[in-house]
Amino acid sequence: MNKRKKLPIGIESFEEMRKEDFYYVDKTRWIEQLLAQWGKVNLFTRPRRFGKSLNMSMLQTFFEVGADASLFDGLYISQNKEICEQYLGKFPVVSISLKGVNGNTFDEARSCLVKVINREARRLQNLSESEKLTQVDKELFEKLLSPTMEDGTLSSSLLELSELLEKHYEEKVIVLIDEYDVPLAKANENGYYDEMVLLIRNVFENVLKTNHSLKFAVLTGCLRVAKESIFTGLNNFKVYSITDVDFDENFGFTDDEVKELLHYYGQDTHYETVKEWYDGYRFGNVDVYCPWDVINYCSDHIANQSLAPKNYWVNTSGNDVIHRFINSISEPQKLTKLELENLVNGGSVQKEISQDMTYKELYSSIDNLWSTLFMTGYLTSRGNTDGNRYDLVIPNREIRNIITEHILKLFKEDIKQDGQKVNAFCDALLTEKADVAEKLFSDYMQKTISVRDTFVQKPTKENFYHGILLGILGFKENWLVTSNRESGDGFSDIMIRVGDSEVGIVIEVKYANDGNLEAECKKALKQIDDTGYAEALYQDGIHKVLKYAIACYKKNCKIMLETEKC
């Protein structure tokens, strides 16, 4: 059997991808489409981890003078002989990524931008030896290598590089700017947004508007920033967002591409799982998967077929927008709470989406937060109903898990503020007052989002209520609470050792799909008895065990109690 190609986890260099024999999902049709559409300045916005940086590297590798044509052998674009003859390896390219332009202060971030320019100038170091550049040109180029770049030089740096490259190669220049919006996002987080907007606007205006050496430019980012903030005065400026049909297959993996990848690695039987967890993003007219998720899942399961799916995407960001959104849902926003509950449970909401906000506006209102959730990939569209109004859903199980985890996290933070109620609930359990505990637990459930999605399996629903219960019990002092502890013939949901007391508690949580809470409680009590969950407590010296069954359905619950003495 031939050796399989390596999976490209974290590989963003097209050249490395091809030379080192990584598995590559062919996106070179983007080159053909770009040239056919022909925009002078083109901005593509997609959520994180959808292959933007790799695509930009592919453009640079294709267009730049001295390109290795063999890297495109067997790929889609190699079939278009006319384009290859006219464009492959024919143009100077300025290519930068603003991903690392960050800092606690404006000066720190500015210094990062200077380093980005320095790095690109060093990559184009051959300009300093060019016989076609004057001494003045070369002195100007030396300034682009300086770590102490003046403001005027920094603002015109990409323009100057373009002009010098055109002089040297006698060809117009292609400009590629990856992650264009990262400096703005970081500036907004750290309090120097206005200064950074001014700097980025000056750099972009010079290179994209007043640049006679420009062939065309491509920019990528996560969000479409209001044109008035940094793209002022650009006339031939095209934006392709997640709602646009043009270029809809160029970012992310299509269903056919995922099937082919899984088949190549012998993972065909995992298709339905991968689809449930990582598909569902709607770009234009196409449903796509998150490449980062698919590749990581495939890699993990080549090593261990029995591994459960993971939330890979969540680890690539702080997920701040979800935290802000859920945290903003207070009593005045009861409708928003119901809408989020509907989404978590597999439904949809209709919202007006604004794609022309500044970073300052992203979190300024509930309406803007809906738009931000959509543009950053936490929600996706199932179609637009009228103008900018879209039918929004959670794309897949991974994102639903991320949102649910944040709901539970904030629920626990709220619980922490009310120690009196925590004590009341725990005391009710300890003093065998099941009816009081039932009322208090019902009150807790009214304040959070319930999981009743018909597409979510019963154990997943039970895990959610289990999480709520653990959130409450975890704040009770002197209680040793263990979850899914091995005991008897199986695993109890929750087991509690109450300080120095000779009383222990076993809790089994069930979800009543049909709403019959009492029947589900009886099943839970029988399960505790049949599997010997209490045995471990007796082995620890406990003489009395309180066996609680808690059945939940939507926001309703039933608690039943049986006691047992050793």
What are the roles of these predicted feature ranges?
Residues 1-461, 476-478:
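Phosphate-binding site recognition
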Residues 434-566:
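Structural signature of nuclease core domains in nucleic-acid processing machines
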